[in-house]
Structure formats: structure tokens, C-alpha cells
Amino acid sequence: MLYTEKQREPIELINEKRNGLKSYNDMSSNTKTAIRKTLLREQGHLCAYCMQRIDLQNMTIEHYIPQNQSDREADDMLSIDYNNMLAVCSGNIDGANRKSDLTCDKHRGNIPLTVDPRDEYSIEKICYKDDGTMYSLDPNINRDLDETLNLNCTTTLFKQNRKSVLDVVKQGILKRSAENRIAKRQLENMLAKLQTKNDEKYVPFCGIAIWYLRKKLSRY
């Protein structure tokens, strides 16, 4: 999971609100498409939760504070608040035979979360194991990752994909430090590359590599 700095809402949403838009269900398809495009650019075309690649065809708009109309806490104004919106994947719905196969918002439902992609402090509490497992020493965030969002789901390739990204970074470090201890500047360059979008896109599952490089840099 990566920190997402929310940007200005798309002009299409601003105009609809000016024209009296009161709830997400009344929003036009054109405005929803504009929101999807803006969210994708904002998040580097990665799911806000699992960090797999998403695009216009396989993403959905997630309300961080759930806005299901059956929920007594639903708030029409929050349903059209751009700051409450995230782009997420399909939640493994095509490969699911039971609920335990679902991930991200499809597994979450309307359960409140502690971890928040919009809050850098909470994202910094996420850790990873060498096998790609996501966890946190904060019990509430750990529950979000492992249970509510099911981000270590064994019927997906999430853990394997994270491990693959981490292995590439480790191999790069080994190659650069074959003769000497890798320079801090080299680690900073590797980190900067992962944190920079290429053609509006981040590397899928890059969170584990960013976490690893930051940990290495903290020792200098």
C-alpha cells in the first residue's frame, strides 16, 4: 500500500455539484469516468490497497468511508466527496469461489479501516516479510491488512509478486555492492526511481521495495 496525496477533484465533478448534485447514485457516467481517470493518475495506476496494476476497464471507485445505501452511517455528501474516493481493483472477484478468495474492497465490505492510503503516517506503519507478507506492529492496521482487506490471500499472487519486486531490488543492491558497501546516494537513487511515475504509472507492488530501501537508508 502506498501513500496517496489527494489532488484537486476533476472539473466535471465540480460542475455537477454546482448544478445541484446531491449523491453518488445521481452522478453522470461522464463525471464518473473523469473521476476514474483522475484517480488512476493520482495513484499511478495501482490499486489503493493491493498495489496491482489497474486501468479504466478493471477498476472501481471505492469510498474510503463506506457509502453503501443500506448502511445507517451513509452520507450523501461523503458519497460525492472526491477526498473520500480511491481507485481499487476488482478484488479477485473473477477467481473467487468463496469470500475468503476475495480481496481489497470486495472482501472489506463496509468494515471501517484504520489504515488509510490518504494518511502517510498510517502507511509508514506497514511492514513486509521476505516472502512478501504484509503486516503491521499496530494490531488494528495488521487486522486491516490480513483480515479485512485480505492482502495476504493465498489464492492470489500478491505475496509472490511482492517478493519478486523485492528480489529485483536486492539483486540490484548486490550487483552495486560487489566490491564496496553500496553508497547512500545509490540507495536514494533507487528509491527515487520507485517513487517516480513513468508515463503516469508506478511499478506494481512497489510498496515492499520502497519500505525495504527506506529501512536500509535508516542505517546510514
Model-derived segments and their meaning:
Residues 63, 104, 162:
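Histidine-centered active-site/metal-ligand motif
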Residues 140-220:
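C-terminal, charged low-complexity interaction regions
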Residues 10-14, 74-91, 119-135:
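Short Fe-S-cluster ligation motifs
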Residues 97-158:
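Long, low-complexity, intrinsically disordered segments enriched in glycines and aromatic residues
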Residues 52-87, 91-100:
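Histidine-centered nuclease catalytic patch
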Residues 34-59, 91:
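Short cysteine-rich loop/turn motifs with clustered Cys
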Residues 2-46, 70-72, 76-80:
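Short, charged surface segments at domain edges that flank catalytic/cofactor-binding sites
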